[in-house]
Amino acid sequence: MISRRSVLALAACTVLGAVGCSKTEEYTGPELILRYAENQPEDYPTTQAALAFADLVAERTEGRVKVVVYSGGELGAEQSVIEQMQYGGIDFARVSLSQLAEYQPALSVLQLPFLYTDAPQMWRVLDGEIGDEFLSGLGAMDLVGLSWFDAGVRSFYTREKVETLADLAGLTLRVQESDMMSEMILDLGAKPAQVVYSRVYAALHNAEIDGAENNWPSYEAMGHYEVAPYFLKDEHARVPELQLASEAAMEKLAELDERFPDIIRTCGKESALAERRLWAEREASAEKHMREWGVEVTTLSAVEKARFRAAVEPMYAAFEEQSRLIQRIREA
């Protein structure tokens, strides 16, 4: 039987035959090649962080491990990626919290609106004991949580100007496919509409919906500002994303070198810091561009924001069993 090393050596000789590689020469490339799934395009902050992760792994393992990043959803949609990771079909991935919460309901609490007062509080929570507890819980899914990525803060944008909670009454607003998001819209006095993301522009243009919600980069990239030029900076949701490894991949790494799993965890944390920096730059750039284009931005006063928070408070009743956790988050 031909060994995997022999097959790789033969492949290397085929490619490098022109420079005199002979069949007796030993293959000197990586000993382990792992796959990383990312559904965003290559210039997106999360994909750039995945590429940084791959570079760090190659450097820290002295070339013994190679991580190949497949961007643009090449390895499938996030739900499929999560399932493939559970049996080791994919080794690493960046996935959204909302998708992972479908398999690990305990994570849903992190999607509650107005859970954090600002970004620094969120990172104190996720980079601290609470975040580590959530990452450890992924072991039940045969996954290893490496780090938390930034996915920005979501706000509303509309066809007509909205300044207060009362102005939202009766409006039809597009939200993600999520029971929690739909409930939030209802509690705010509006009507939720689940429109396919690629159709949101047309739905706004044709007045099928009155508004939608998302972060600054997405608002800019999809051109929604052209048909919904009023941005209500309410910052109702800060929902992070996760960088994961499959347990199967970590076992392979440990077999190769007992130091490698810890190296992977370190690379995961370092690449997450890079992603957050890249995201902050992109978010600031998008907001600046939108303001310059002429988008009218309304920032909620402290009093008005308190009204928004109070309106969605009933949603927290469904998380009574995690009330102590919510208190810990709010006190962080």
Give the residues covered by each predicted segment.
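N-terminal secretory/targeting leader peptides
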Residues: 2, 8-120, 130, 138-332
